[in-house]
Regions:
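N-terminal export leaders
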Residues: 21-22
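Mature catalytic domains of secreted/periplasmic carbohydrate-active enzymes
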Residues: 46-510
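Short hydrophobic alpha-helical segments enriched in small aliphatic residues
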Residues: 11-13
C-alpha cells in the first residue's frame, strides 16, 4: 500500500504538471490524513436527509448514502495483505517510533522511501531498483534471472494448505467486527478466479488458482463478521511496470488508458457482483476514465449497508483513511486508521519483536482512535502457506483479551465532548460514551488508589464502576474535578476503564 491524496480541483490525478503532483503528493504524505484529510472530509460529506429508495448514477444521489450503524459501531477490523509478495516475504526493516511514521521526512529525500520501502508487498517494485537492499537480497537468494512472477507456482502450491476457517475463528475470538482482504495489490496478481482477462499476463501468471476471496468471504460471514475487499485501482504493474523510484515516477505509473479503465471497472463490478462486500476499499486513486459514478450507484443499490473509502479520490466517500497515523482531535466524518502490527503490511520475515507493537501499545492505539471517532483496521501479514506468524497471533489475542473485559467502552460508543484528559498525577485518559454512561479510560496503571480526574462534574447520585471489577466505587467532587477510589486490585492490564452513570457531566473550563 502507498497512501495518496489529491485535490478536488483535479479529476482523479490529472494534475497540470509532474512538479505539481510531486509537491502535492509529498504534502499528502506529510499530513497523511490530518489537516488535508479534514478538508477533504468536509468537501465530501454525506448530504443530510433520508437515503433514496434507489441510488441514481449521480454524485448528488450517491452522497445521500449514510454511514451505516454497523460500521460506526464496529471500531476494530482486520486487514489482510497476502499474495505473491508473501513468498519472498522480505523488505528492509525500520527502526524508531512504532506508533506512527514520520512521513514529513520523505520531503528531504523522496527517493529514499522507494529504495528502502519497508512494505514487503512492494517487493516487485523495490527489487527492480538496482542496488536497493531488496534488489541485493533478491539477487543473492534467487539469482538475477529469477522473475517475480516465478513465485506464482510456489504461492499456488503453498496456498492450498490454507484453512480459511481458522483465520475466521481467530478474528472472531480477538474481537474484530469486520475483515478487509487484498484482492489485487499493485503487482496485478488477483486473489480470485477472475473472468476478466489481463492482456499483459499469461493466464497461468494472472492470479491464484484457488478462490481465496470466495473461501475467506464464506468463512468470515459464517462467524457473523462483515467482509470487505481491497482493490488497487491506482497502480497495476502489469499495465505500467516498475520501478517507481520517486514521486515523478509514481505519477507516470498510474495507468490512464481506456484499456486499463475498462479492466479495473470490470474487476470491481465482478467483485461486487460475486461477493457483495460490506466494505469497498480502493488504494492510490482510480483511473480517470473509470465509471465510478455508475459503479457506486450499483454497489449501494445491491449493498445498501456497504461503505466506500476515500482513496478512489472522487466526490464521495463514507470514511477517510489515514495510514500509520491518526487524528489528534475528534473528527466528525467517520475515519479509519490502517496499519500493520509492524512496519510492513505484508509478512516481512526480517521483522522482529522490536518492530512489532506491544500489547500495551496496541490497546492504547485502539482506545485513542475510538475516542476520536475512528476505527482501527489492523493488518496481519500471513506467510505463503496461510499461517499467521506467532507474534501476530499473540498480539491479536492480547488485544482480544482486553476487549473481552473492556469492550463495553469501545464497541457501539461515540466520542464524548472531548477525547482526552488527565488525572492530577499525570495519567492520560481517553473518553467515550454510550447510552447513559461515560467511560474514562486510564491509559496506564495509576500509582495510587485515589485518583482525581480534572475538569469533570458528575451529578449527585451518579455511580462509578471499573469494568472487570465488582461493585460501585467511592467518589466525590473535588472542586471542578472528580476524585475516585479505585479497587485494591486493578483488573486486567494495559488500560483501565471507569464507567460513570449517568453521563450528565459538565466540563468546566478556566
Amino acid at each position: 500500500m502507498l497512501w495518496e491524496r489529491r485535490s478536488r480541483l483535479h479529476e482523479h490525478i490529472a494534475f497540470h504538471s509532474r512538479k505539481e503532483f510531486t509537491q502535492h503528493f509529498i504534502v499528502g504524505f506529510a499530513m497523511l490524513g490530518a489537516a488535508l484529510a479534514l478538508l477533504v472530509a468536509d468537501a465530501r460529506c454525506q448530504l443530510p436527509g433520508k437515503p433514496p429508495a434507489k441510488y441514481e448514477a449521480s454524485w448528488m444521489s450517491i452522497n445521500r448514502h449514510p454511514v451505516p450503524r454497523w460500521y460506526e459501531d464496529a471500531k476494530f477490523g482486520i486487514f489482510i495483505h497476502w499474495g505473491l509478495y508473501s513468498v519472498p516475504a522480505w523488505a528492509p526493516t525500520l527502526r524508531g517510533n512504532k506508533m506512527e511514521f514520520d512521513w514529513s521526512k520523505l520531503a528531504a529525500d523522496p527517493g529514499y522511501w522507494f529504495r528502502n520501502n519497508p512494505y514487503a508487498e512492494w517487493y516487485l517494485n523495490t527489487m527492480s531498483i538496482k542496488d536497493s537492499p531488496t534488489w541485493k537480497h533478491h539477487v543473492e537468494k534467487y539469482g538475477a534471472n529469477f522473475d517475480y512472477y516465478d513465485f506464482v507456482p510456489i504461492f499456488n502450491r503453498e496456498s492450498q494448505k490454507w484453512r480459511p476457517e481458522q483465520w475466521a475463528e481467530l478474528f472472531k475470538e480477538v474481537g474484530a467486527q469486520y475483515v478487509v482482504l487484498v484482492t489485487k495489490h499493485h503487482d496485478g496478481f488477483t486473489m480470485w478466479p477472475s473472468s476478466v482477462h489481463n492482456p499483459h499476463r499469461e493466464p497461468d501468471r494472472q492470479g491464484a488458482q484457488r478462490d481465496i476471496v470466495g473461501d475467506l468471504t464464506k468463512a468470515v460471514r459464517a462467524q457473523g463478521l462483515k467482509m470487505g475487499l481491497y482493490y488497487s485501482g491506482g497502480l497495476d504493474w502489469s499495465f505500467v511496470g516498475p520501478p517507481i523510484q520517486n514521486f515523478q515516477d509514481l505519477f507516470a505509473h498510474v495507468p490512464q488508458s481506456e484499456e486499463y479503465a475498462q479492466y479495473a471497472d470490470a474487476h470491481v463490478r465482478e467483485l461486487i457482483g460475486r461477493y457483495q462486500p460490506s466494505v469497498l476499499w480502493d488504494d492510490i486513486s482510480y483511473p480517470k476514465k473509470g465509471d465510478l459514478v455508475h459503479i457506486f450507484a450499483e454497489y449501494y443499490n445491491g449493498v445498501p449497508e456497504g461503505v466506500i473509502n476515500d482513496r478512489f479520490q472522487v466526490e464521495h466517500s463514507d470514511f477517510t483513511t489515514p495510514e500509520y497515523t491518526q487524528y489528534t482531535k475528534i473528527v466528525e466524518k467517520k475515519w479509519e486508521t490502517c496499519r500493520g502490527l509492524g512496519f510492513s503490511f505484508a509478512y516481512n520475515q526480517d521483522e522482529g519483536p522490536e518492530q512489532v507493537l506491544s500489547p500495551a501499545e496496541l490497546v492504547r492505539l485502539l482506545v485513542d482512535i475510538v475516542s476520536k471517532n475512528g476505527n482501527l483496521l489492523l493488518n496481519i501479514g500471513p506467510k505463503a502457506d496461510g499461517t499467521i506468524p506467532d507474534i501476530q497471533v499473540e498480539r491479536l489475542r492480547a488485544l482480544g483479551q482486553w476487549l473481552r473485559m473492556n469492550g463495553e467502552a469501545i464497541y457501539g460508543t461515540r466520542p464524548w465532548v472531548r477525547p482526552q484528559g488527565k488525572t492530577q498525577d499525570g495519567v492520560d485518559i481517553r473518553f467515550t460514551q454510550k447510552g447513559d454512561s461515560v467511560y474514562a479510560i486510564l491509559m496506564e496503571r495509576p500509582k495510587a488508589r485515589e485518583i482525581t480526574i480534572e475538569s469533570i462534574w458528575p451529578e449527585e447520585g451518579a455511580t462509578a464502576q471499573m469494568l472487570g471489577a465488582t461493585g460501585d466505587l467511592k467518589w466525590s467532587r473535588d472542586g471542578k474535578n472528580i476524585k475516585v477510589t479505585l479497587p485494591e486490585q486493578l483488573p486486567g492490564d494495559y488500560a483501565y476503564v471507569l464507567k460513570i452513570t449517568p453521563k450528565a457531566w459538565q466540563v468546566v473550563k478556566e
